[in-house]
Amino acid sequence: MKDTIRQLIQQALTQLVNDGVLPEGLSPAIQVENARDKTHGDFASNIAMMLAKPAGMKPRDLAEKLINALPASADISKVEIAGPGFLNFFQNTDALANRLDAALADARLGVRKAGPSEKVVIDMSAPNLAKEMHVGHLRSTIIGDSVARVLEFLGDNVIRQNHVGDWGTQFGMLMAYLQENPITSDELSDLENFYRAAKKRFDESEEFATRARGLVVKLQAGDPECLALWTRFKDISLSHCQKTYELLNVKLTMADVMGESAYNDDLANVVADLKAKGLLVESQGAQCVFLEEFKNSEGEPLPVIVQKADGGYLYATTDLAAVRYRSNVLNADRALYFVDQRQALHFNQVFEVARRAGFVGHPMQMEHMGFGTMNGADGRPFKTRDGGTVKLIDLLTEAKERAYALVKEKNPSLTEAELRHIGEVVGIGAVKYADLSKHRTSDYSFNFELMLNFEGNTAPYLLYAYTRVAGVFRKLGKGFDEVEGNIVLQAAHEQDLAARLAQFGEILNNVADKGTPHVLCSYLYDLAGLFSSFYENCPILAAETLEQQQSRLRLAALTGRTLKQGLELLGLETLERM
């Protein structure tokens, strides 16, 4: 609808230029926002205030001329001037009802991407292997997953890449410890304790550390025995990751793994190409790129080190190789990096070096989608009581158990199987939604009590809201797609719900553009609240006429489908009963 209004305004501006009211050469960014007060319309634009000065007119006078120049539209019932010169647009309720009827008949709910379809790489999750995933991996994994789902729903070709840390000193450490302590595969499956023991030896024994580094050199040289051990450790670690992804209902598989080791063969070429471009400077034996845009507190350019004095490569080297691969091999239009916002400087530097070196041969937009920290109740990074890292699988298991106990208390008559299933859906959904509902760049405090509450902006509330809609149709013995008739908007609660339903596509395009799933969370929470008001004030099954009942059932059906689709795009399962 906003695009329709922008087009109408653009036609009016063209008319006013032709009439000599506005000077030629104007190309304003036409802004159309949702009106805050529905009594003053559904949408508002400040275009008259933006152009009043070049027009040499008062904003309200220009607004009046704009209204007179606006083409007639079946979508708009009237346009009014408000305040200093806002244009307030009232949408035609019949046209709105027709759009919703069309959305209900569409598998995609009438949602279309605002721009052309693109190929998008999503760099997400990326745990360091050789140990189990911890809570610090949650945000990259589920935010990246949600944005990937939205992009796919809008029609983009999404390539998920799990840039795991599968190379480096930690593997030499594990191999050295395994040589000292031969164990069975079953014992090795407890990778966390094995890693902890190896790290202790590495920190306490210089002889052990030297041996571990030597094994890394042998691994890098392709030693068959070291490669076999490395593969063994990597496979065990990835299997742990996959179990966590499946529990989280995240669309990541082994086929999506594109770890650091995948770029090993290109690292020397990256350095050579940077040198050929004249970008490298030797500093204390290391090969660096200095960028004037990035300086330290003394005003000196910061180095982007791509090769250490001992010949070793760094994260920047691998990331540059990945940029080149994603642009020139995958031919991606966008590459979205869901990595902690504390890495912003690193990625800004890498992206700039890649551009200068010509590594981005295919025009590719590189975006660091940074995120804040998940903290404990004390506002500090989430830790165990003894200060250790919390395994992600342990956190999710506790969430399931807490939700199970809560559901059992409320519904003791359910079978054990039903309780376990509902407990898992609610528990995992609660953890994910509590994270996704916060602005991506914000820190937040993890709180089981708040996220498992059935009131407020939580997963349990939204899951229950969906079951409430589903319950209406269960009583009828019908599905959402089995309601005849047409939507007719008369009551205010019907119109409010309808107006919000019509914004689903706009919301999803916003998420896709900015990588912000919290926008979708807020929308679904608002939609659930509007449905609750509609349900309480507009009888559905006890409607006065058949036509009214069918109309309200169709509104309910579209609400149910939108809630279900929205939750699915967040990576949350839904329940038909709770």
Curated annotation (Swiss-Prot):
It is an enzyme of class 6 (ligase). Its main location: cytoplasm. One of its GO terms (cellular component) is cytoplasm. InterPro entries: aa-tRNA-synth_I_CS (IPR001412), Arg-tRNA-ligase (IPR001278), Arg-tRNA-synth_N (IPR005148), Arg-tRNA-synth_N_sf (IPR036695), ArgRS_core (IPR035684), DALR_anticod-bd (IPR008909), Rossmann-like_a/b/a_fold (IPR014729), tRNAsynth_Ia_anticodon-bd (IPR009080). A motif ('HIGH' region) lies at residues 127-137. PROSITE patterns: AA_TRNA_LIGASE_I. Its EC number is 6.1.1.19. The keyword Cell cycle does not apply. It catalyses: tRNA(Arg) + L-arginine + ATP = L-arginyl-tRNA(Arg) + AMP + diphosphate. Keywords: Aminoacyl-tRNA synthetase, ATP-binding, Cytoplasm, Ligase, Nucleotide-binding, Protein biosynthesis. One of its GO terms (molecular function) is ATP binding. GO terms for biological process: arginyl-tRNA aminoacylation. It is found in: Cytoplasm. The keyword Protein biosynthesis applies. Monomer. Belongs to the class-I aminoacyl-tRNA synthetase family. HAMAP family: Arg_tRNA_synth (MF_00123). PANTHER family: ARGININE--TRNA LIGASE, CYTOPLASMIC (PTHR11956:SF5), ARGINYL-TRNA SYNTHETASE (PTHR11956). This is Arginine--tRNA ligase. The gene is argS.
